[in-house]
Amino acid sequence: STAFKGIGGSRFFDEYEQEDNLKSEVTGILCATCDGCEVCWNKNQAILSGEINSMIKAVIRHEKKDTIIDNSYVQRCKKYPKMVEEAINAFGRMEVNKAWYKRLLDNRTVIAQQLDAMTKVLENWSYDRQNIDITKQFARAKIKREALECGIYVSEIHFYKTKEERIIITSWIKSENGGVPVKEFLRCCEKITGLRLRLQKECKGILAQEMTEVTIYEDVKYYVLTGFSGQKKNTSMVSGDNFSMFDTDEGAYHICLSDGMGSGVRAYQESELVVDLMEKFIEAGFETDTAVKLMNSAMVLKGESDSFSTLDLSSIDLYNGKLTMIKIGAAATFIKRKDEVTIVESESLPAGVDIEQDIEKITKNLKNGDFLVMVTDGVIEYLNVRNPQERLGAIISDITTDNAGVLSQKVLDKVLLDTGGYVMDDMTVLAIGIWEK
């Protein structure tokens, strides 16, 4: 990707080179075909050159055509109005070319980022899991024998260890007569390994007579319960906020919240795209920061300069409770531990503004009974206090409940009390509680 980024380099010039190019183009078209060219340039070259430079600078400042003509920057030229018109046209072409070339550079940057992303995915596949069949030969044989007693034939079984020292078991199995629950095989593996295990997300419930691939993971320590409350802007038909909550086989739970610019259908479509891209990238195996970069580059190349969306991504490792947050133009997040609330903020531009978006990861540790509260800007912005983040933190702290749904609804209700019940922007409140199994 480094070599790819280096191809070509920038072909656009600084301000002085831009002036020279415009000057050369204008004089090449008008002066070269003018009968008075020799008189003007031989007798008054220094003066004429300075006057044309002043006119060119006015064009670059985007002054109006009539204003430039009235200022008479070039006093001795009978074709001065035509010269101004030609300079404006030439500058317009130069700006268009510059914009298109920037898009090409952005495309090249995106492709380089995609190459980097694919490299990371391949590296993760190479180093994330290590085959340990040799050290698990006895366990593999016992699982095959135990499964056979349950009517399950095991064709292949392999043990892997992740970089976090967790066990993954992959197998090809079938039921001789069909109709055996796959959980029977899970119980066989738990009995032999002495570990608490779980099946992959997309796993058949009943084994058939055909071979089926089954992957088993070490079970996680925590589970989550979630709640959602929201209101659309009073003058809108639909909320411009979107969110998604999903877990992965690797034992992570992801919450993705996006607030589209403005409100209504356009904002909804933009935030929906952000959430959809993030979910697909993460489920495809990309790390969260890489997924954010790919999503951002897609939004930049979408090419709509006034269409941006925020991204608030929280990922919880259900093995150890580690929380990782990435905020792209998003509102503050609140972590509630009993009656104490921690406010997490980050300043960054919304998605789609800059192709080289800075990605900052914020990490916290969650414990049994903690709540994560994520909101969009509409929940905070219209609290009529000097520090709305602290006000919302106090609201969350005062609520006593172990129910995520109740927490999210009470937060929204109390915010609406502060705004007099009027919803001036789309409001979304997500509450995620983490509990030990």
For each feature predicted by the language model, list its residue ranges.
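Intracellular, membrane-proximal regulatory regions of polytopic membrane proteins
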Residues: 1-141
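Catalytic core of PPM/PP2C metal-dependent serine/threonine phosphatase domains
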Residues: 131-164, 184-186, 190-211, 268-338, ...
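A short interface-forming secondary-structure element
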Residues: 169-178, 330
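N-terminal entry segment of metal-dependent catalytic domains or homologous docking segments
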Residues: 205-260, 266, 272-273
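Short beta-strand-to-coil "C-cap" segments at the C-terminal boundary of structured domains/repeats
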Residues: 217-219, 432-437
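PP2C/PPM family metal-dependent serine/threonine protein phosphatase catalytic domain
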Residues: 218-242, 296-302, 331-363, 413-417
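Acidic loop->beta-strand submotif enriched in PP2C/PPM serine/threonine phosphatases
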Residues: 236-252, 311, 343-384, 420-421
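Active-site-proximal, acidic helix/loop segment immediately C-terminal to a metal-coordinating Asp/Glu
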Residues: 260-284, 347-348, 366, 370-419
